[in-house]
Design a protein with these regions (language model features):
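Flexible, small-/acidic-enriched active-site or ligand-binding loops
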Residues: 173-176
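Surface-exposed loop and adjacent secondary-structure segments within mature catalytic domains
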Residues: 181-186
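Short aromatic-enriched loop/helix-cap "lid" or pocket-rim segments at secondary-structure transitions
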Residues: 49, 178-180
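Cofactor-pocket helix-loop regions in the catalytic cores of large enzyme subunits
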Residues: 1-170, 188, 192-263
Length: 263
């Protein structure tokens, strides 16, 4: 089963993602599939897409939840699949009931009729997938937006399905390693400043700047980064950039000078 409809959110896949992605996207279109790019910017991928939806920056979550709301209201949700593989679907459906296309249109800058059409096309296609990259991870609602991508795939029954969002076997089975090492828990300890709970041994990266700035026992005074750019990828990157300059010691292992390694 090949993809019939692919919605790429905050992704410039033809240029920056998997090897030879531009060819793969072209083949998707040649098979009769539709490529929809949801991105404020007319990127290289948006330029070759069948449809470019220029959402207002930061409104990705609202747009995606509105699409889910349309699918649920229209009776297109794969409820049998959801009953077998998920918990809490009815609670989620109730929670997003106010995200109507009419209300979201003003926020997202996308006409209500377009939101409705996109939702119907996604849920009704023989196969479809919503795919997102770092573009949706750089705004105030990035966590909700990332969740909404999975939610959209789930209500349409596309998680783990042929032509949908598949789960390939990774080279390194990190979930299994987490279980074996005992690092797969939740809230066993909390961050020093705000008391945010850990998940699988980590706290949100958004705590990094405050842990550097706040004086006291356990204050972060040194940092090692490896092939990463937290100033760009962590929320409120400018605050983190200011905090990095006040560290006692910092090492960055990377091939490039970027927003983080320059410190």
């Amino acid at each position: 089963m090949t993809i019939g409809c692919m919605s790429a959110i905050g992704s410039n896949g033809s240029l920056l993602t998997a090897p030879d992605m531009r060819r793969r996207l072209r083949e998707l279109q040649e098979r009769g599939g539709k490529l929809v790019v949801i991105d404020p910017r007319r990127s290289e991928t948006a330029h070759i897409a069948d449809e470019h939806v220029a959402v207002v920056p930061g409104a990705d979550a609202a747009l995606l939840l509105a699409m889910v709301q349309v699918i649920v209201k229209a009776g297109l949700a794969q409820e049998r699949w959801l009953e077998q593989h998920t918990r809490g679907f009815q609670e989620v459906a109730a929670a997003i009931s106010d995200f109507t296309p009419e209300r979201v249109a003003a926020v997202a800058g996308v006409p209500a009729e377009v939101i409705v059409r996109l939702a119907h096309e996604f849920a009704s296609a023989r196969s479809s997938v919503a795919y997102a990259r770092i573009g949706i991870c750089n705004n105030a609602y990035s966590t909700v937006a990332s969740y909404a991508v999975d939610l959209l795939n789930a209500v349409a029954g596309r998680l783990g399905a042929a032509g949908g969002a598949v789960f390939p076997k990774p080279a390194i089975d990190l979930p299994r390693l987490s279980r074996l090492s005992g690092a797969d828990g939740f809230a066993r300890w909390k961050s020093r400043v705000r008391g945010l709970p850990e998940t699988a041994g980590d706290v949100p990266a958004s705590t990094l700047a405050e842990e550097m700035e706040t004086v006291g026992t356990g204050q972060v005074r040194a940092l090692v980064t490896f092939a990463g750019n937290p100033v760009l990828t962590v929320p409120n990157g400018q605050r983190l950039a200011r905090a990095l300059q006040k560290l006692d010691f910092m090492v960055s292992i990377d091939m490039y000078i970027n927003e983080t390694t320059r410190f």
